[in-house]
């Protein structure tokens, strides 16, 4: 499989503040890759360097075979960008906005096809000013898609959405997988990364704290937890062999004629992995 | 060229749909023209009929409102909204975009000039401007100089909310000091010194000279030079300070 994005030892500082301190990763063509991390972890800086908006201080970056800092119009034909804030002309209709931006590309998708893809058929001829926040965000995605790019950058595509709008956006993004697009998305929502991404890199203070498939990340971490209450106190056991430990526990409890109150067996969620990776180290 | 036509078509559509621009840059100068024209259009100002004098003043008002104020505010709003940033991620070349935007401004101002002259002729019996070629060239020179100043100014304005405040603080005093609505001779001397530095003063004198003084544009090299210098100052600042992404922090 060919590589769409290669980042190697990327560094960027703003004055004294080092926003990105040696980040390396690769994204294969057709992959959905997530950059996950809290605010200020360096996600947007990294993405904006890949989009060609910012100059890097050190490291090498190749996006679709070119250095974004020196990219030309032909390169821009192949990328689509959804920025954190949806910026569009408030007095144009949905269809006009798509036609305007589509006109910048050699081989745009048809307006109606994109309208359907983002599920705004009912709003096709409404002006942007009258759209809801979620509808604007979907048009945002449409504007990034109308040039039929190979690579899409989505910077926090669902921040500020209500749960229903997020699910709709997820469906739109998932449907792009079928089109064979490579996607780099940033998010601080774990469920979003878990749901959408093939692979995830967790950024923390400008470095990659962990990287892998969402399942691998959870697998690499703390073992299974068994919790129950005894004499009003909570007992927490961690084990690599949950089956055996659970068997021993229940046998003993049965023999004693006791109930294991509030018994719970759980694997760590990506959330806990994430928190353990991104939490400030305590003194 | 295809991209330029595409962008120009949409810029004109965006312009025509903007109520703010329609009112502040198009209607307000006309309203003031009519009001002042009925108030002292029959007096004599600077050796011509008051309404004829006001016609030139209104063209000056139009050029700062459309080419300077309107353009500055549109660019700052688009920049701070992130629209310019989004455009940078598309294959639309920056020069094509800016040329289309400036052409739109120029077209809007020339339409406005036609309307101002038509109102002057029908409401106050003004005569059709003589030396049409020099007249149009003077309007274009003025619009270009003020557009350059406007683009330059965008680089110095940090926030969207600041744009109209800064623009108004510059252009209303300039409008009055340049003598667009009253004769400058009646001002105290220090204000006349300020007026002598303002680009609008030279635009007014140039157009006045072409329309009522029997001059061609090349008979007034001092006015042309002053406008050109101001335009170059604007262009110089624009090249150094113009930015595509929202001002941070």
Predicted features along the sequence, with ranges:
Chain A
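Conserved ABC ATPase "signature" region
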Residues: 99, 103, 108-124
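ABC ATPase "signature
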Residues: 211-212
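Short, charged/small-residue-rich alpha-helical element at the C-terminal edge
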Residues: 216-283
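Catalytic Walker B motif of ABC-type/P-loop ATPase nucleotide-binding domains
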Residues: 152-156
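Conserved ABC transporter NBD signature motif
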Residues: 59-67, 74-75
């Amino acid at each position: 499989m060919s590589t769409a994005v290669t980042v190697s030892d990327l560094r960027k500082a703003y004055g004294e503040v080092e926003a990105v301190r040696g980040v390396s990763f690769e994204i294969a063509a057709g992959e959905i890759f997530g950059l996950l991390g809290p605010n200020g972890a360096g996600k947007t800086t990294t993405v904006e360097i890949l989009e060609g908006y910012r100059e890097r201080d050190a490291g090498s970056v190749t996006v679709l075979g070119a250095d974004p800092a020196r990219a030309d119009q032909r390169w821009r034909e192949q990328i689509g960008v959804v920025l954190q804030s949806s910026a569009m002309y408030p007095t144009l209709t949905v269809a006009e906005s798509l036609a305007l931006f589509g006109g910048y590309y050699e081989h745009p998708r048809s307006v109606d096809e994109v309208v359907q893809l983002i599920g705004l058929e009912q709003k096709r001829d409404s002006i942007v000013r009258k759209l809801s926040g979620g509808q604007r965000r979907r048009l945002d995605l449409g504007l990034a898609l109308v040039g039929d790019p190979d690579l899409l950058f989505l910077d926090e595509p669902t921040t500020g959405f209500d749960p229903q709008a997020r699910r709709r956006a997820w469906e739109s993004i998932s449907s792009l997988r079928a089109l064979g697009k490579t996607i780099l998305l940033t998010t601080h929502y774990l469920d979003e990364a878990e749901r959408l991404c093939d692979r995830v890199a967790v950024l923390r203070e400008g470095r990659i704290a962990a990287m892998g498939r969402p399942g691998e990340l959870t697998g690499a971490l703390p073992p299974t937890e068994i919790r129950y209450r005894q004499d009003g106190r909570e007992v927490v056991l961690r084990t690599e062999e949950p089956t055996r430990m659970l068997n021993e526990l229940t046998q003993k409890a049965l023999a004693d004629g006791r109930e294991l109150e509030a018994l719970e067996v759980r694997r760590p969620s990506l959330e806990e992995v994430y928190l353990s990776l991104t939490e400030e180290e305590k003194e | 060229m295809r991209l330029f036509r595409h962008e120009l078509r949409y810029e004109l559509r965006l312009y025509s749909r903007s109520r703010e621009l329609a009112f502040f840059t198009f209607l307000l100068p006309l309203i003031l023209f009519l009001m002042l024209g009925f108030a002292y259009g029959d007096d004599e100002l600077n050796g011509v009929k008051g309404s004829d004098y006001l016609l030139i003043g209104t063209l000056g008002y139009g050029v700062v409102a459309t080419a300077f104020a309107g353009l500055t505010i549109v660019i700052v709003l688009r920049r701070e909204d992130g629209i310019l940033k989004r455009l940078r991620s598309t294959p639309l070349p920056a020069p094509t975009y800016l040329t289309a935007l400036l052409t739109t401004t120029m077209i809007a101002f020339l339409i406005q000039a036609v309307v101002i002259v038509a109102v002057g002729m029908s409401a106050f019996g003004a005569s059709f401007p003589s030396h049409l070629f020099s007249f149009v060239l003077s309007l274009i020179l003025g619009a270009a100089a003020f557009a350059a100043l406007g683009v330059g100014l965008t680089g110095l304005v940090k926030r969207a909310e600041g744009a109209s405040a800064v623009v108004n603080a510059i252009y209303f005093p300039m409008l009055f000091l340049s003598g667009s609505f009253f004769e400058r001779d009646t001002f105290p001397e220090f204000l006349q010194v300020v007026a002598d530095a303002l680009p609008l003063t030279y635009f007014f004198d140039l157009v006045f000279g072409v329309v009522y003084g029997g001059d061609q544009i090349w008979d007034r090299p001092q006015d042309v030079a002053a406008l050109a210098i101001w335009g170059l100052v604007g262009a110089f600042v624009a090249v150094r300070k113009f930015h595509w992404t929202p001002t941070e922090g």
